[in-house]
Amino acid sequence: MQITLPGVVLTNSPAEKQHVIVKIFSPAGLLSAFAKNGASLSCDFRESLFPISFSLFTIQQSPPKMRKVIQGELQNPFTTIKSSYPLLQSAGKMIQAILKTQWHEKPSPHLFSLFFNFLQRIPETQYPNFFSSMFLLKLLQHEGSLDLSRSCTLCKTSLESSTIYRYEGALFCEKHAHEETISFSQEEDHILRVIVQAKKFQELVCLAEFPIDIDTKIDALFSSFLSETSEPSSLYYKGKTLL
């Protein structure tokens, strides 16, 4: 059976001879596929297999064999990202976040749309690392792992006017904070909430025009979430909710 789907190549790994195995993120989720002679100059869709490339793929499915890329029509090579180290580094951060949180074959149309739009908009930003950290926050929200209440998870003390401590998906007051929690001032937590609640990309792009020193804390918060999860990129979705 053949299917046609849009997708962004996240990784491209060499196989024997000049074959490659690509990991593609699409509305259908994270997929791995084999491309015969994909690294060869004679492959007419070789460029569609490069990492950070958006293409329309024709894929052959013959279980239990690995999917096979039959054709790829390059739609957007994201040349601007690939020609700038800061942009490339920031895009790579988003890619790693997807690889570390998403299960194979779990449909994620909303997350794919979010990721694709972040890739399109990141060249417009003055602070791409901050912009990619915004994606990590949106991803935490998508996974249902970002507490937006205003009270301590343990004692329910109001955090309206005090330093807020976050770890994984929980909020803590100063009394229940531990050495691994990440502290956010009221102003920093307000910015975090503005990012999460933003409904338009232009709002995020505008926010990323300011040198707001919060990206390191967001990245640390995301890492705390990963510390309690398995390695989803090595597992397969079996048609049931796993997260």
UniProtKB/Swiss-Prot annotation:
Record's GO cellular component terms: bacterial nucleoid
InterPro entries attached to this UniProt entry: ARFGAP/RecO, NA-bd_OB-fold, RecO
Keyword match DNA repair: yes
GO biological process, one term: DNA recombination
UniProt KW keywords: DNA damage, DNA recombination, DNA repair
One Pfam family from the record: RecO_C
Keyword Transport: no
Family assignment from sequence similarity: Belongs to the RecO family.
Function statement: Involved in DNA repair and RecF pathway recombination.
PANTHER family: DNA REPAIR PROTEIN RECO (PTHR33991:SF1)
Protein name in the entry: DNA repair protein RecO
UniProt gene name: recO
